[in-house]
Amino acid sequence: QTRANKFMWLGTAQLFDAFAFIFEKTEAGWIWAHAYRFDETRSTFIVECSEETWRGIGFDHMSQDDAIATCERIFARHLGGNPLLTNAGHLRGSAAWINFRRVLCERWSFDNVVLLGDAARTAHFSIGSGTKLALEDAIKLAEVMDRPHIAQDRASMAEALEEYRTERHTEVLKIQNSARNSTEWFETLDRYIDFAPKQFAYSLLTRSQRVSHENLRLRDPVWLGE
């Protein structure tokens, strides 16, 4: 399933203390970034917008360098003078912009090939669970493959791989449902963007339905009490 919004995966030397959502209004419409620090010197900076805004800004006919420079201007006050970085410099024109693809495979193994992570299923980047899910897949796969004599017994191998798929598939469905809710929230941003700031923040925080009103009360009772 291919989703509606366009996004470009970038990086920056600007460091963010926590996962940040940054919204900027342009003449063509709203554009936003999902930003988070991933090591001591770099942050991920994913730029996303509707296709209408994407075309309105002119990204559809810009070179990648021009598109990055445009994003640097749009988000300048959040970048502290740092440039935006790409590891996809080989892509021409608008090819660096992607529509997210939701993937869910029914079968996770065939013969001696086993899928994990995004190869088996995807979860939208707005909930930040892709790496976590892949590592949990690897842990479960290692667990079932480490059983005695499994390599010499094809029936036991098949049972182990089905246990891996069944257990991880159930967990993945929960995450994908939350990811779908989050994806759709960003795809329909116009419904929420004119809310009062606190109402907008509440909607943003609860968009996936993984975080409920009571979850927020536990995390920040003072803010919620306001």
Regions found by a protein language model. Give the residues of each.
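C-terminal helical "tail/cap" subdomain of flavin- and related membrane-associated enzymes
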Residues: 143-226
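Active-site flanking residues adjacent to catalytic metal/cofactor-binding acidic residues
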Residues: 116-118, 136
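Central beta-strand plus flanking loop segment that forms part of the substrate or channel wall
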Residues: 1-27
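FAD-binding beta-loop-beta segment adjacent to the flavin cofactor pocket
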Residues: 98-116, 173
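Hydrophobic/aromatic residues within well-ordered alpha-helical segments
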Residues: 39, 71, 137, 168-171
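Conserved FAD/dinucleotide-binding core of flavoprotein oxidoreductases
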Residues: 17-102
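Glycine-rich phosphate/pyrophosphate-binding beta-alpha loops
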Residues: 98-105, 120-132, 183
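Active-site Asp-x-Gly
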Residues: 124-146
